[in-house]
């Protein structure tokens, strides 16, 4: 099992990998984890900025001789290499591992290719100064657009190339499967939902859970939770601009990504219906308590990703209000939440709509969450491992 990020290193992909590993061990599989030296895996040596990641993995595989190598893939976890002279050339520090490894590889893609509009924003193209062409178009912006476009194509090719070189790929939605596999008849990309289960069972009642975080206790008052790392991709910039509907409080809890140096500055000063817990990265029991204290999660994401927060929320019986991205649409179509255009007005309206039909959404979520149990998820992985190991 390969994942740079692994507990006690904080991070959603590391949490996921740890839970999956434990579930596979319960099935009787022998699982060995390779991670960062600060993680609790059996092997270490991986790091996002280590140009020798491939060599580290190849040596471990050669010594251990496993039946399957399972890589939890998010490009940033293994180091992105940008060629300034050739924008078409983008790679990672485990590319050579995929080329040279003789053992079948299964790769889980925690995010897929992104759209051009998500990759290139107007602010990334236009600076305050620049040479102007005859038509008044900033020449530097045009050149920058072309470079970003080439980078965009190359970046998306990273995930597609990893799938091509894997015996099998795993994604968390049918949309992500189609995006990566392009409708290929090879059926190389498999949908296995992101597992999640509460750390506390039986569930805490709402009153008790809210007391632990000093949250509003009024009867009928609902809490929408925004939880995760403080990165721009989470889209939290619209939260302060929302007109939070009557009867709702927005609760925010964020932490800094361990590897990502980005640390979005968020200020909720003067907001009476937004509570910032400032609790940072939570332990498993604390996170479950916070979900039990809430009624919904709010996910104003800017880019498509396999949202672990959404799956954690669903596992605790919470519907969502999320950006109208195709990933979230797939789950909204199953009655698990609402998608909205990514602006303050539409997200406020989404909370109102959720409240008016809350029982319907809650029932759908409670039925769906059975699919996220780790025992079921691990069995699907085990079946795929055996099929991948048999196939020549």
Language model regions located:
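Short hydrophobic beta-strand element within catalytic cores of glycosyltransferases
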Residues: 319-322
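Conserved acidic donor-binding segment of nucleotide-sugar-dependent glycosyltransferases
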Residues: 334-345, 351-358
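Conserved donor-binding/catalytic core segment of Leloir-type glycosyltransferases
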Residues: 216-234, 240-244, 251
């Amino acid at each position: 099992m390969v994942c740079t990020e692994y507990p006690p290193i904080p991070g959603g992909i590391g949490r996921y990998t740890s839970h999956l590993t434990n579930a596979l061990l319960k099935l009787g599989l022998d699982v060995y984890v390779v991670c960062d030296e600060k993680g609790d895996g059996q092997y270490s040596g991986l790091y996002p900025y280590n140009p020798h990641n491939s060599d580290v993995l190849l040596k471990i595989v050669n010594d251990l001789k496993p039946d399957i190598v399972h890589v939890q893939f998010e490009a940033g976890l293994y180091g992105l290499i940008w060629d300034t002279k050739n924008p078409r050339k983008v790679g990672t520090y485990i590319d050579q591992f995929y080329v040279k490894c003789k053992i079948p590889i299964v790769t889980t893609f925690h995010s897929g290719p992104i759209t051009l509009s998500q990759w290139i924003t107007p602010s990334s193209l236009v600076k305050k100064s620049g040479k102007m062409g005859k038509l008044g178009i900033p020449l530097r912006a045009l050149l920058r657009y072309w470079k970003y476009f080439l980078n965009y194509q190359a970046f998306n090719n990273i995930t597609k190339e990893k799938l091509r070189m894997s015996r099998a790929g795993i994604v968390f939605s049918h949309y992500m499967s189609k995006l990566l596999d392009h409708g290929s008849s090879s059926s190389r990309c498999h949908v296995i939902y992101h597992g999640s289960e509460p750390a506390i069972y039986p569930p805490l009642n709402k009153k008790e859970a809210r007391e632990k975080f000093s949250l509003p206790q009024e009867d009928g008052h609902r809490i929408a939770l925004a939880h995760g790392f403080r990165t721009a991709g989470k889209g939290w910039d619209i939260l302060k601009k929302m007109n939070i509907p009557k009867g709702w409080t927005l609760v925010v809890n964020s932490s800094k990504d361990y590897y990502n140096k980005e640390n979005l500055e968020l200020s909720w000063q003067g907001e009476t219906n937004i509570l910032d817990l400032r609790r940072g990265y939570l332990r498993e029991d604390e996170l479950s308590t916070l979900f039990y204290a809430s009624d919904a999660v709010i996910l104003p994401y800017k880019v498509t990703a396999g949202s672990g927060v959404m799956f954690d929320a669903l596992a605790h019986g919470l519907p969502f209000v999320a950006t109208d991205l195709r990933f979230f649409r797939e789950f909204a179509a199953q009655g698990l939440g609402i998608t909205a255009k990514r602006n303050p007005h539409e997200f406020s309206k989404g909370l109102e709509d959720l409240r008016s039909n809350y029982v319907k959404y809650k029932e759908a979520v409670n039925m769906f969450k059975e699919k996220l149990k780790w025992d079921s998820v691990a069995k699907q992985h085990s079946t795929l491992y055996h099929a991948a190991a048999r196939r020549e």
